[in-house]
């Protein structure tokens, strides 16, 4: 996925799923399944239920995304 094609949205983590997947509710009300980006996984960034996150999505599949940032 090219960086300029990505859509970045803000959301809140609703649920933790197996294999470092998360259910995230976006600000517009949609619920998507998201996984952690490689740099967050490498640096052991912990994501818990209720965290505010930035999700990067592709325009081709708006039901899946990648968590690229966790707000403090």
From Swiss-Prot:
Q: Which GO CC annotations does the UniProt entry carry?
A: cytosol
What pairs make up the disulfide bonds?
none
Keywords on record: Cytoplasm, Initiation factor, Protein biosynthesis, RNA-binding, rRNA-binding
Subcellular compartments:
Cytoplasm
- Which domain of life does the UniProt lineage start with? Bacteria
Q: Which GO terms describe its molecular function?
A: ribosome binding; rRNA binding; translation initiation factor activity
> Which InterPro entries does the record cross-reference, listed alphabetically?
NA-bd_OB-fold, RNA-binding_domain_S1_IF1, S1_domain, TIF_IF1
Cite the Pfam families for this sequence: eIF-1a (PF01176)
User: Where is the S1-like domain positioned along the sequence?
Assistant: 1-72
Name the HAMAP family for this protein. IF_1
Family stated for the protein in its record: Belongs to the IF-1 family.
Q: How does it assemble?
A: Component of the 30S ribosomal translation pre-initiation complex which assembles on the 30S ribosome in the order IF-2 and IF-3, IF-1 and N-formylmethionyl-tRNA(fMet); mRNA recruitment can occur at any time during PIC assembly.
The UniProt function text for this chain reads: One of the essential components for the initiation of protein synthesis. Stabilizes the binding of IF-2 and IF-3 on the 30S subunit to which N-formylmethionyl-tRNA(fMet) subsequently binds. Helps modulate mRNA selection, yielding the 30S pre-initiation complex (PIC). Upon addition of the 50S ribosomal subunit IF-1, IF-2 and IF-3 are released leaving the mature 70S translation initiation complex.
The record's NCBIfam families line, in alphabetical order, gives:
infA
* Protein's name in the database: Translation initiation factor IF-1
Q: From which source organism is this entry?
A: Aliivibrio fischeri (strain ATCC 700601 / ES114)
Q: What is the lineage of its organism?
A: Bacteria, Pseudomonadati, Pseudomonadota, Gammaproteobacteria, Vibrionales
């Amino acid at each position: 996925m090219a960086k300029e094609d990505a859509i970045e949205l803000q959301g809140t983590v609703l649920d933790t799923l197996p294999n470092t997947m998360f259910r995230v509710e976006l600000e517009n009300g949609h619920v998507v399944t998201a996984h952690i980006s490689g740099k967050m996984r490498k640096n052991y960034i912990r994501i818990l239920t209720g965290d505010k996150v930035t999700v990067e999505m592709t325009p081709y599949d708006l039901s899946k995304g990648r968590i690229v940032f966790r707000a403090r």
